[in-house]
């Protein structure tokens, strides 16, 4: 009987744990190595919004449609401890200094917010609580035999011919593997020191989580909001099944600190976000703020993720750069990576558009 493949997954975000889950379900032995905390970066702080067909004119379309279905399946199979729910989604706008016109059709929204149309129905849009989703998938993977190890990936173990056969942790420990996957979100760019990989950048986003109880119905909102200064923000507001409401705005290109624990907000960003929330919603103005948070989403030069083999290096794989759709696309990425590593090719989605070799590799110096 052949021995189960040992697969080292660098990074315990949604992408890493989804790969661990699908590999473990197939009888492999994945080990997730995480520096800070599972779901401790964007995968625990993001919006968790899912859309079936919002990538229809992009190379992401097939991945996204597959993933939307897998989210429903995973919630059903694993008891939905992450509040997966379908909901309608609307778009609109507001101007900070517009006089409030009295309550509109939605009493929880200020009268100055104009809803301009429906962007999605419960058939096409859904939501998960991302921290619970990422933790839940990690636990499900562990139930199938996956391991979680705390450690900082500091290098790779190579055979004389160049094949990757493990990782080196800070402190010197070696962890052997039949396959190594770089899934460290924006920190994946560190792996370009060891592998021919393109740059992965980080875009910072700020968000607040309010305890809104029953005051906000199950409707997601995408707004354009003009501040008194004239600057336009594009807030997204997602009411969750657990009685909280997540809202974000203010994305900035900032250097990513080496240690994910050191991610900090831009000066003044939370105050600006809180002022906006008071302005658009009396329900938010009255609700306690449970969490103020900032995180980086991973982005490549052309906006598409890197999913597949590292070109020219046996045993090395990459899965990162999912930008604004990492929570949505985690399941189909996990499934495809498990197929690629265990069967030699992905069957459900074509990974060709996501090949790392399409972009120029960083100079390892
Ligand atoms: C504000 C905001 C809102 C978003 N909203 C949505 C949304 O509504 N829907 C959606 O689909 N997507 C959304 N996204 C995008 C989504 O959150 C990301 O694409 C996704 O979380 C990326 O997951 P990841 O696993 O690649 O990276 P991460 O979540 O960043 O995980 C990477 C992990 O690697 C670890 N790591 C780093 N360095 C090392 C090292 N040296 N050794 C070991 N481990 C290391 C980190 O600690 C981290 O846990 C949003 C993103 C942001 C910023």
Question: Model-predicted segments: where are they?
Answer:
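Predominantly flavin-linked oxidoreductase catalytic cores and closely associated redox partners
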Residues: 128-217
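C-terminal catalytic lobe of FAD-dependent flavoproteins
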Residues: 279-365
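Conserved FAD-binding subdomain of flavin-dependent enzymes
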Residues: 22-25, 35-89, 96-107, 228-230
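Flavin (FAD/FMN) cofactor-binding and adjacent substrate-gating region
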Residues: 73-151, 155-163, 168, 299
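Residue-level detector of alpha-helix initiation sites
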Residues: 13-14, 37, 324
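N-terminal Rossmann-like FAD-binding beta1-loop-alpha1 element of flavoenzymes
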Residues: 5-31
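Active-site substrate-recognition segment that forms the wall
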Residues: 21-22, 48-50, 82-85, 186-312
């Amino acid at each position: 009987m052949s021995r189960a493949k040992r697969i080292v997954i660098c990074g315990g975000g949604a992408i890493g744990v989804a790969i661990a889950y699908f590999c473990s379900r197939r009888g492999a032995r994945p080990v997730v190595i995480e520096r800070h905390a599972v779901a401790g970066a964007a995968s625990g702080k993001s919006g968790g919004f899912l859309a079936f067909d919002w990538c229809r004119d992009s190379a992401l379309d097939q991945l996204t449609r597959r993933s939307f279905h897998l989210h429903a399946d995973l919630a059903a199979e694993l008891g939905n401890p992450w509040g997966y729910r379908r909901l309608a989604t609307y778009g609109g706008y507001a101007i900070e200094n517009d006089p409030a016109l009295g309550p509109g059709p939605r009493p929880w929204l200020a009268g100055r917010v104009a809803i301009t149309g429906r962007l999605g129905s419960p058939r096409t849009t859904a939501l998960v609580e991302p921290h619970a989703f990422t933790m839940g998938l990690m636990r499900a993977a562990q139930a199938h035999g996956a391991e979680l190890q705390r450690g900082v990936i500091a290098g790779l173990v190579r055979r004389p011919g160049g094949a990757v056969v493990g990782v080196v942790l800070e402190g010197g420990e070696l962890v052997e593997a039949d396959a190594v996957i770089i899934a460290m979100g924006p920190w994946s760019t560190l792996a370009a020191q060891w592998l021919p990989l393109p740059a992965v950048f980080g875009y910072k986003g700020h968000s607040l989580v309010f305890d809104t109880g029953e005051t906000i119905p199950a409707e997601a909102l995408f707004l354009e909001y003009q501040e008194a200064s004239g600057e336009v923000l594009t807030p997204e507001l997602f009411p969750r099944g657990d009685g909280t409401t997540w809202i974000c705005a203010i994305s900035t290109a900032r250097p990513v600190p080496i240690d994910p624990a050191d991610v900090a907000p831009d000066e003044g960003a939370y105050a600006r976000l809180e002022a906006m929330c008071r302005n658009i919603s009396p329900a938010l103005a009255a609700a306690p703020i449970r969490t103020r948070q900032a995180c980086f989403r991973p982005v490549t030069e052309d906006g598409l993720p890197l999913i597949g083999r590292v070109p020219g290096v046996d045993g090395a794989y990459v899965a990162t750069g999912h930008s604004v759709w990492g929570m949505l696309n985690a399941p189909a990425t996990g499934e495809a990576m498990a197929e690629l590593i265990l069967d030699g090719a992905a069957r459900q989605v074509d990974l060709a558009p996501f090949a790392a070799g399409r972009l120029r590799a960083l100079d390892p110096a």
